[in-house]
Amino acid sequence: MPSLESADKLSNKLAAIGNITSDGRPILGLDCEHLLEMVLEADERGVLIPAHIWTPWFSLFGSKSGFDALEDCFGSLSSHIFALETGLSSDPDMNRLWSALDRYALVSNSDAHSGENLGREANLFEGTPSYDGIFDA
């Protein structure tokens, strides 16, 4: 979110729906299109980047997600998705084999869930260290 105020606004909306403090992974009973709608209502400059898109079960492209395409997940708001976070279940070369991902910026992160892979992937930005600077990079 572009500001602390808009982040608080979104946080309050999400807290009214479900548990956002459980263990770092909010438990919400809403679909992805509605979540993105809430992000954009909190601030029109807000961004949602689907994360861990290749996690095998319930990720965007997981076998249990029910989605065959990003558009199935985000519906009429799909055009607001410009980047995807690949997660540790893939690698950059694998991601570029699927041409449907060519129109998205791909970001990769490592996290404490997989200690042996910590730091395996990272994002490097050149430019001003600010919210807008990320998008200008």
Where would I find each of the regions flagged by the language model?
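Alpha-helical packing segments of well-folded alpha/beta enzyme cores
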Residues: 31-35
